[in-house]
Amino acid sequence: MSDNIYSVSQLNSAARQMLEGNFCQIWLTGEISNFTQPVSGHWYLTLKDENAQVRCAMFRMKNLRVAFRPQNGMQVLVRANVSLYEPRGDYQLIIDSMHPAGEGLLQQQFEALKMKLAAEGLFAQNLKKTLPHFSKAVGIITSSTGAALQDILHILARRDPSLKVVIYPTAVQGKEATAEIVQMIELANARQEVDVLIVGRGGGSLEDLWCFNEEEVARAIFRSTLPIISAVGHETDVTIADFVADLRAPTPSAAAELVSRNQDELLQQLRHQQQRLDMAFDRLFTRKSQRLKQLALRLQNQHPQNQLRAQQAKNEQLTHRLQLAILRQFENTQQKFTALSVRLKQNPLPYRIQRYQQGLEQLKVRLNFCVNRQVTERQNKLATLCGKLDGLSPLKVLARGYSIAENPQGKAIVSVKDVNQGDFITTQVADGKIVSKVL
């Protein structure tokens, strides 16, 4: 008996994980039966063939994109994920997209070619050519008898009657359409008589529009040196040509509006630009006029006569200031003289002389006293120093019986090593010198 014992829930969960993990999204064709749509909006159905059947579910957010109403007995192509409904243990498919069997095969081819061309870089945004801002000539590659051409011509005539139009007629449906569309694209590029190309047609089924999903058409659009606008079918129709073209228009009429200039809009733009130009000119004129007035005023201020007047006024001002300064100086001097006169009157000169003489006598007495005191102090200090110096004199030492011996060079002899045999030495005593010879 196995050690792993599953519950029913565990088994169903493991089976669901195994199914979902081992099956990527798959394409499946079969006949619809048991189709139901409850109030939730989800679709529940069975897909079957002669030998087997499988339960399927398509949730509401997915089935809203389906362009038809499924019916029992209808053959369809679905893209789905394999799963398992755990509460009942039912193996089922969760449908992502659904197409009638014929269109479904075309849709599968569409997706495969789209992935291939995208991988090669044919859809790269950096390779898209820019449409001219103002086209002088536009080329139209479409059926010469289709309603799309008439819609384009009508809009171009209404919006931009002066725009040159070149029609490159081609089939846009059937076996010959692909080759003719490629041929017209190459012809337009060879002639170089237009600025931009519109490639498109009116609405139709997927089979009707299929020539615009052909690889040859996609590569011709990619090789074109002229900018190309794809305008195939209605807004909901998407083709390979839309991805490769430099710009996609939702309809042929919209493409005509993209390449044409609306005359009324152009006139309005011209009026607006004229207004802006007038306003700019007025601002420039006003600014230049103000500048001219400023320069004229500066020129007037810098005129020699004006400068001379200004200098004269400055000289007069300086002269006036100098006169005021002299007058103030004279008044100050006069005030000082008056003050001195008053002081002289208050203190007569003889009295002041007598007072100064008395002060001078006092200073003389004080000076004599200070000088005598300084001389006495210096004499006493000198006598003290002389006594000390006399005590240190070599003569005093000699007087006490000592003597000083000197070699012939006059240096004092302090050791027997300082003399040699035969040298004459001099001996200094208190009252004279004695010359001796060393034996």
Curated annotation (Swiss-Prot):
The species this protein was found in: Haemophilus influenzae (strain ATCC 51907 / DSM 11121 / KW20 / Rd)
Pfam assignment, any one: Exonuc_VII_L
Protein's name according to its UniProt entry: Exodeoxyribonuclease 7 large subunit
Main enzyme class: hydrolase
Main location: cytoplasm
Family recorded in the similarity comment: Belongs to the XseA family.
EC number: 3.1.11.6
Keyword Hydrolase applies: yes
Gene null: resulting phenotype: Essential, neither gene for this protein can be deleted.
Reactions accelerated catalytically: Exonucleolytic cleavage in either 5'- to 3'- or 3'- to 5'-direction to yield nucleoside 5'-phosphates
Subunit structure: Heterooligomer composed of large and small subunits.
Job description of the protein: Bidirectionally degrades single-stranded DNA into large acid-insoluble oligonucleotides, which are then degraded further into small acid-soluble oligonucleotides.
Alphabetical UniProt keywords: Cytoplasm, Exonuclease, Hydrolase, Nuclease
Gene Ontology CC: one annotated term: exodeoxyribonuclease VII complex
One annotated GO biological process: DNA catabolic process
Gene Ontology MF terms in the entry: exodeoxyribonuclease VII activity; nucleic acid binding
Subcellular location: Cytoplasm
InterPro entries membership: Exonuc_VII_L, Exonuc_VII_lsu_C, OB-fold_nuc-bd_dom
UniProt cross-references to CDD domains, sorted A to Z: ExoVII_LU_OBF (cd04489)
